[in-house]
Amino acid sequence: MKFEIFLVLALSLGQSAVYSIVSFLDKVTRAPLGEQTTSMNNPLSARPWFDLTYQLLDIAFALVPVALALYFMARSLGLGPRQVGFDLRRPGRDAAWGAGLFLAMGLGTLGLYAVGRALGLTTALSVANLEGYWWTVPVLLLSAARHAVLEEVLMLAFLFAHGRALKIAPWALLLGSALLRGSYHLYQGFGPFIGNAVMGAVFGWVYLRWGRVMPLVIAHFLLDAVGFVGFALIGPAIGIGG
């Protein structure tokens, strides 16, 4: 079971955390973080249709570890998507909880980003140019959905289920999941690391309390959708992008 955890994380968010830490060390030893910029959702090709193809392939293949995690949960623990709340049985309630969490975490995220920028501990974020192609916004929304499903299913449903089976204390699962979530955002600076670690702790507590991952997927999708699309529209006014 430990190997299953290692395999899933090594193919996905654990790998991202390692690269993020290395990227952070590269940046922090190069120049002050406040003077650097982190680009998000960059084009993958200068040729539009190949860029679209690469973007869609990237989204599709990034979800393979989710399928692997669901398979391991079913095979080793007898848990299907329904048992971890990854379903559409309660769309209204899940959407309401997701929207509430989005509002609470979104304000905190903006605040930590602003503080990090003011203290020079967070890089400037450069977001996608929405005027690029007609498919830019749909692909960004698909990317937001990809991140939401990948992170919440793996960080909560998969990791917590396997942790319980290994008799790991809930507080240790909560702390480990939160720190890992912060780690794969560390490439953006200290602010996003702290913000995402706090978000991981809050989401983890909500999942432990109610046992449904879908509201957290919805909240995460809304956060990323605003981050990818909304900030491209209002970003220059609040110091993001431009």
Regions flagged by a language model, labelled:
Residues 1-83, 228-242:
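N-terminal, membrane-interfacial amphipathic/helix-forming hydrophobic leader that caps
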Residues 13-17, 102, 106-110, 114-242:
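Transmembrane helix-loop-helix hairpins at the membrane interface
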Residues 21, 25, 52-57, 91-95, ...:
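Generic hydrophobic, helix-prone segments enriched in Leu/Val/Ile
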Residues 79, 89-90, 165-169:
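Juxtamembrane helix-boundary/capping and inter-helix hinge elements in multi-pass membrane proteins
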Residues 83-107:
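Interfacial segments of alpha-helical transmembrane regions
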